[in-house]
Amino acid sequence: ENGQLDGVIDPK
């Protein structure tokens, strides 16, 4: 949701 998961940039 945030766009970040464990330092991985995931634009959602």
Curated annotation (Swiss-Prot):
This is Unknown protein 4. The lineage of its organism: Eukaryota, Viridiplantae, Streptophyta, Embryophyta, Tracheophyta.
